[in-house]
């Protein structure tokens, strides 16, 4: 596979920045990394080469731009997924929700949030129905919300095809 070929060329997998060596070239994963991780790699003297997916990079830039505008970032996705963690690592205080129930609970506990400027972004692999239920709820509740559907179309197509295939198999 790809990793075997990379290892044959002298590439090694590291789990944390403290495993990087000065002068070593480190390629980031497609899911992206937090600002803290990239800073730690550079502090160790590693040369960082970004392999982040352009769709993920776009979400990170949207989040940063929104924060500069004074908006709170709302990420819909799997909170422990590397992509979500990487994007969140570029934000000052993002809200991460996995489903509409979590969104509803948060708004019940923080009713003033509905009037604050915010932006809603999705993990690229977020399940469309989950995203849409969160959008529907927040649209009704929030008075200053920007919504950016950042689900990757190619991923969405594969998810739909997989669901169709499994339905046929049942």
Tell me what each language-model feature is:
Residues 1-170:
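The feature marks the mature, well-folded catalytic cores of soluble enzymes
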């Amino acid at each position: 596979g790809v990793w075997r070929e990379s290892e044959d060329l002298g590439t090694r997998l590291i789990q944390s920045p403290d495993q990087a060596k000065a002068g070593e070239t480190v390629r980031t994963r497609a899911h992206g990394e937090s600002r803290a991780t990239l800073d730690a790699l550079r502090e160790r003297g590693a040369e960082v080469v970004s392999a982040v997916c352009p769709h993920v990079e776009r979400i990170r830039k949207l989040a940063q731009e929104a924060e500069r505008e004074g908006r709170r970032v709302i990420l819909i996705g799997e909170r422990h997924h590397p992509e979500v963690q990487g994007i969140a690592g570029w934000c000052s205080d993002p809200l991460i929700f996995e489903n509409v129930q979590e969104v509803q609970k948060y708004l019940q506990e923080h009713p003033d949030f509905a009037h604050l400027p915010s932006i809603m972004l999705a993990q690229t692999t977020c399940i469309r129905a989950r995203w849409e239920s969160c959008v529907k709820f927040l649209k009704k509740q929030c008075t200053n919300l920007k919504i950016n559907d950042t689900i990757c179309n190619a991923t969405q197509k594969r998810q739909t095809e997989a669901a169709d295939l499994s339905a046929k198999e049942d």
